[in-house]
Regions:
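Short linear/disordered segments characteristic of secreted peptide precursors
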Residues: 8-14
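Short, helix-capping/interhelical loops that line the mouth of catalytic, cofactor-
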Residues: 23-30, 77-134
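Basic, Lys/Arg-rich alpha-helical nucleic-acid-recognition elements, primarily the DNA-binding modules
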Residues: 27-62, 67-70
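Acidic interhelical loop/turn segments
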Residues: 47-58, 127-154
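Short, contiguous alpha-helical
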Residues: 55-96, 144-200, 239
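C-terminal interaction segments
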Residues: 227-273
Length: 273
């Protein structure tokens, strides 16, 4: 399951696009617009479900579709609180000796409710969260699960989580859920947190170049120094699925090269578990 965080703001400094590029107003706002669009896509799927379908088993282990949406609601409530007040105020923070997955699962089990209540709670929470992040000081970091993030980076994690859990919901339902250009934010997040993921696993935090084909099949999204010895290439959709642990790297068409490419592909994440 995981709670979606770019683990350290030092490794996930805000850009919304490529690391190292200046942030203009349009780039700053695009992440919020794209987060809203991703949430609206999920809302359309959920609005058509009957009560029985809410109880279907999702692709998130141990959770029904209603459980997944409840988790998203709880996470958005926490995001709204931190974007407004700068801290989680007793939300989904993790205590010593507890994993994020365990904390999230416990929170869901404590607050299960009827599907209509869960759906309405998520709708309120996601609207409040998006409004709070838009209104927040763009340069002032706020507390998130295991570190501090600027609001646009926080929004990127919310986009990553809604997209991945959207896959968890759409798959069992057989709902249409095509890849979109919004994956660029998620791919950026996955690449930007690679140094942390590598170092935590005891691997050298060496530069890794990612060259990813966008969903339109024409654009190529490039992250990382062009002269990096290690690289990952392939479809952006597969890269994002691997980072979300929705696809085994060995079953993807992604190619890793150089001394650290294979380790980077194995360890890439858009969240901390």
């Amino acid at each position: 399951m995981g709670l979606w965080v770019p683990v350290e703001d030092a490794l996930a400094e805000e850009s919304g696009l490529l690391a190292g590029r200046p942030v203009c107003h349009s780039a700053w706002m695009s992440i919020f617009d794209d987060l809203g669009a991703e949430q609206e896509r999920l809302e359309k799927i959920l609005s058509g479900l009957d009560e029985a379908q809410w109880g279907w088993v999702s692709a998130a282990q141990g959770w029904t579709i209603a459980d997944v949406v409840l988790h998203l609601a709880q996470s958005e409530e926490a995001a709204a609180a931190t974007a407004t007040h700068g801290n989680l105020r007793g939300g989904l923070g993790v205590v010593a000796g507890e994993t994020m997955d365990a904390r999230a699962d416990a929170a869901v089990r404590m607050e299960r409710a009827a599907p209509a209540e869960v759906f309405a709670r998520w709708q309120r929470a996601r609207q409040a969260s998006l409004a709070a992040m838009r209104a927040a000081d763009p340069d002032l970091p706020v507390q998130w699960m295991v570190g501090t993030l600027k609001p646009a980076t926080l929004a990127t994690t919310r986009l990553a989580e809604h997209w991945a859990h959207g896959l968890d919901i759409a798959g069992p339902l057989g709902a249409d859920f095509p890849d979109t250009a919004r994956l660029r934010h998620i791919a950026w997040l996955a690449h930007r947190t690679l140094p942390y993921a590598l170092s935590v696993a005891g691997e050298p935090a060496a530069p890794v170049r990612c060259e990813l084909t966008a969903p339109d099949g024409e654009q190529v999204w490039r992250f990382g120094p062009p002269d990096a010895e290690s690289a990952i290439t392939g479809a952006a959709g597969e890269f994002c699925r691997v980072a979300a642990q929705r696809l085994d790297p060995a079953r993807s068409g992604l190619a890793a090269s150089g001394p650290h490419g294979a380790a980077a592909l194995r360890l890439v994440r858009t969240y901390a578990a």
